[in-house]
């Protein structure tokens, strides 16, 4: 039978509930337990797929094609378990399900209300499909007191009574701010947060307290007394240099022991932390440094590229080097020469994006990388712009463009209207809804033998996650290949280009998919490991 850990947050947002949940999952896994992580998001969007990256951050795509919260990326990176569409739900999805049921008459004429209908829908989501797991960790988005989160709080309160005795534990993540004028850490914000949580009927078993310095024993006793929590269950969560230090730090503070003790599991099996200790050691003791320029459209909010950033760091871990990131807004290169910005970097990465804004800057970045022999990694939109650059400057197709930007006589990149998924043909139209209508999730690709990318993967058959509407037009394949750009990977049916590369370039690869979504600190993605290795070689030349 699965045991449930509910993680809530208080005082302020962005305290790191997702990292805390992921780290706890990793610690329980290290003890041999089977762990599942789920995220409950209070916003009214059905999913984050149509939300602005500069407002919500990255949209994390699962193998089965769900557009989910970026915290699911943390869950995957820390536990190695691939998430599914059933691991994330929003208020919007819950209400949509309920309204659909009401329209079908499933409620048999009953008045549909928050209690019991909304709360039951939430409870069903939390408890379904957990037969194969020992622990289910549920993160509740937002902060205690948010009006949007109230149905979720009520649902997890009810679950405390619905589930068998001793199978639900509540962890509350709070902030203990340091006041310089007083020269001390303050407990009052945490006290008020717990008081508000208790007013909702939820009594936390464990307090996970964020702080930028050691919490004195006297302050722990104070929190224990006023928050009605065992002193041993007041766990300090101190700031660390890397998020991959968090599992070790939480284990040192006894979080996993306290969770298991709250479930009555004593003595608990000892954790195997060697892999995490090796990662932490590699991060602390790099043997070199490389600088990677990220030429993007959403550089104002780094969370828009969360998985990408982490995948680059994973490449650094694989090569025992520190990865320094230079963020460049792509629009800059539409007005200025890229050379002063890019001459000193060791690699250029152009990530995914949508829309015409900044596209010419990305094209100019690709041209600089091609001509100057600087390692270039184009992902999704970054691959498309590299192909447009080749079409214009190598194949002489001056009007080469993407139909995403409007009508064009030379649609080197165009809207996909149909593609094969499994054994079924999927179709889309330009007039269709934006939400959930892209080519989403894991698709297979066939790599051309003897190409650089096939050598990196070590296999001609790969599966990677996609999120795009537009695709390089296969009708231009022969003209582009005659100019030196090799289409090194195609969809199994040979219709959709998946990867491109220049054989005469040290490292120039474009991919239509998002390899960053499958990279892990304990298992770096081969493309990122190879890209950073190429950047390391470049650093010796600059």
Curated annotation (Swiss-Prot):
Binding site for L-glutamine: 353, 381-384, 404, 469
Superkingdom as given in the UniProt entry: Bacteria
Disulfide cysteine pairs (residue numbers): none
Domain Glutamine amidotransferase type-1: 291-541
GO BP term (any one): 'de novo' CTP biosynthetic process
Residues noted as binding ATP in the record, renumbered to the chain: 14-19, 71
EC number: 6.3.4.2
Residues annotated as binding Mg(2+): 71, 139
Pathway noted in the entry: Pyrimidine metabolism; CTP biosynthesis via de novo pathway; CTP from UDP: step 2/2
Region (Amidoligase domain), start-end ranges: 1-265
SUPFAM superfamilies: Class I glutamine amidotransferase-like, P-loop containing nucleoside triphosphate hydrolases
Pfam family, one: CTP_synth_N
Principal EC category: ligase
Gene Ontology molecular-function annotations: ATP binding; CTP synthase activity; glutaminase activity; identical protein binding; metal ion binding
UniProt: UTP binding residues: 13, 186-191, 222
Entry binding sites for CTP: 13, 146-148, 186-191, 222
Keywords: ATP-binding, Glutamine amidotransferase, Ligase, Magnesium, Metal-binding, Nucleotide-binding, Pyrimidine biosynthesis
PANTHER family: CTP SYNTHASE (PTHR11550), CTP SYNTHASE-RELATED (PTHR11550:SF0)
Subunit structure comment from the entry: Homotetramer.
Miscellaneous field: CTPSs have evolved a hybrid strategy for distinguishing between UTP and CTP. The overlapping regions of the product feedback inhibitory and substrate sites recognize a common feature in both compounds, the triphosphate moiety. To differentiate isosteric substrate and product pyrimidine rings, an additional pocket far from the expected kinase/ligase catalytic site, specifically recognizes the cytosine and ribose portions of the product inhibitor.
Family of this protein: Belongs to the CTP synthase family.
Stated role: Catalyzes the ATP-dependent amination of UTP to CTP with either L-glutamine or ammonia as the source of nitrogen. Regulates intracellular CTP levels through interactions with the four ribonucleotide triphosphates.
Name of the protein: CTP synthase
Species in which this protein is naturally found: Sinorhizobium medicae (strain WSM419) (Ensifer medicae)
Lineage of producing organism: Bacteria, Pseudomonadati, Pseudomonadota, Alphaproteobacteria, Hyphomicrobiales
């Amino acid at each position: 039978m699965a045991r449930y850990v509910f993680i809530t947050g208080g005082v302020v947002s962005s305290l790191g509930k997702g990292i805390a949940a992921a780290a706890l999952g990793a610690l329980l896994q290290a003890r041999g337990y089977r762990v599942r992580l789920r995220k409950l998001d209070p916003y009214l969007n059905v999913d984050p797929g149509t939300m602005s990256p500069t407002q919500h951050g990255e949209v994390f795509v699962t193998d089965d094609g769900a557009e989910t919260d970026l915290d699911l990326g943390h869950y995957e990176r820390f536990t190695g378990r691939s998430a599914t569409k059933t691991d994330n739900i929003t208020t919007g999805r819950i209400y949509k399900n309920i309204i659909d049921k009401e329209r079908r008459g499933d409620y048999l004429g009953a008045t549909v209300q928050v209690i019991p209908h909304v709360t039951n829908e939430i409870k069903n989501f939390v408890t379904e499909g957990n037969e194969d797991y020992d622990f289910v960790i549920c993160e509740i988005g937002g902060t205690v007191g948010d009006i949007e989160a109230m149905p979720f709080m009520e649902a997890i309160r009810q679950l405390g009574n619905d589930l068998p005795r001793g199978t639900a534990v509540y962890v509350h993540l709070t902030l203990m701010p340091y006041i310089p004028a007083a020269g001390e850490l303050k407990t009052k914000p945490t006290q008020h947060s717990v008081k508000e949580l208790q007013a909702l009927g939820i009594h936390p078993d464990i307090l996970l307290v964020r702080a930028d310095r050691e919490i004195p024993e006297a302050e722990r006793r104070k929190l224990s007394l006023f928050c009605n929590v065992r002193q041993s269950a007041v766990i300090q969560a101190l700031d660390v240099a890397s998020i991959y230090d968090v599992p070790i730090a939480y284990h040192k503070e006894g979080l996993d022991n306290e969770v298991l003790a709250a479930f009555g599991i004593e003595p608990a099996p000892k954790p195997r932390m060697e892999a995490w200790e090796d990662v932490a050691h590699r991060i602390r003791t790099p043997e070199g440094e490389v600088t990677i320029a990220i030429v993007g459209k959403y550089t104002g909010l780094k969370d828009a590229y969360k998985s990408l950033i982490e995948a680059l760091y994973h490449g650094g871990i694989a090569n025992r080097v520190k990865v320094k990131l230079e963020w460049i807004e792509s629009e800059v290169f539409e007005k200025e020469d890229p050379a002063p910005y890019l001459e000193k970097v060791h690699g250029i990465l152009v990530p995914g994006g949508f829309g015409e804004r900044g596209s010419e800057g990305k094209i100019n970045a690709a041209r600089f990388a091609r001509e100057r022999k600087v390692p270039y990694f184009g992902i999704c939109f970054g691959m498309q712009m590299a192909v447009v650059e080749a079409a214009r400057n190598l194949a002489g197709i001056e009007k080469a463009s993407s139909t995403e930007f409007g009508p064009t006589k030379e649609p080197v990149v165009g809207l996909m209207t149909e593609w094969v998924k499994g054994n079924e043909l999927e179709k889309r139209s330009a007039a269709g809804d934006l939400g959930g209508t892209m080519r989403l999730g894991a698709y297979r690709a066939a790599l051309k033998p003897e190409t650089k990318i096939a050598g990196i993967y070590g296999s001609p058959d790969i599966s990677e996650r996609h999120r795009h509407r537009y695709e390089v037009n296969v009708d231009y394949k022969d003209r582009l290949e005659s100019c030196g750009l090799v289409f090194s990977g195609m969809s199994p049916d040979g219709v959709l280009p998946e990867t491109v590369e220049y054989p005469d370039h040290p490292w120039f690869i474009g991919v239509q998919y998002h390899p960053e979504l499958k990279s892990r600190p304990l298992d770096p993605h081969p493309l990122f490991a190879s890209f950073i290795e190429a950047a390391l070689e470049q650093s010796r030349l600059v």
